[in-house]
Amino acid sequence: MSLFPVFVVFGLSFPPIFFELILSLAIFWLVRKLLAPTGIYDFVWHPALFNTALYCCLFYLISRMFV
């Protein structure tokens, strides 16, 4: 259960997990932009799978902070 209530914006209701998803997506974009110049993607076997796992880990960390 999250600490945040359901948000209603212009008649649309958004569950608290929606904002956690958006926040983790913003952090994911930032981390991906920081990792790209380092050349870490040269050592990754499957970049799309790596990005998916990175996003899942970030989402888990963000969601654990708000519980």
UniProtKB/Swiss-Prot annotation:
GO terms for cellular component: plasma membrane. Pfam families: DUF1656. InterPro entries: DUF1656. The chain crosses the membrane at residues 3-23, 43-63. Keywords: Cell membrane, Membrane, Transmembrane, Transmembrane helix. It is found in: Cell membrane. Its main location: membrane. It comes from the Bacteria. It is a multi-pass membrane protein. Belongs to the AaeX family. HAMAP family: AaeX. This is Protein AaeX. It comes from Enterobacter sp. (strain 638).
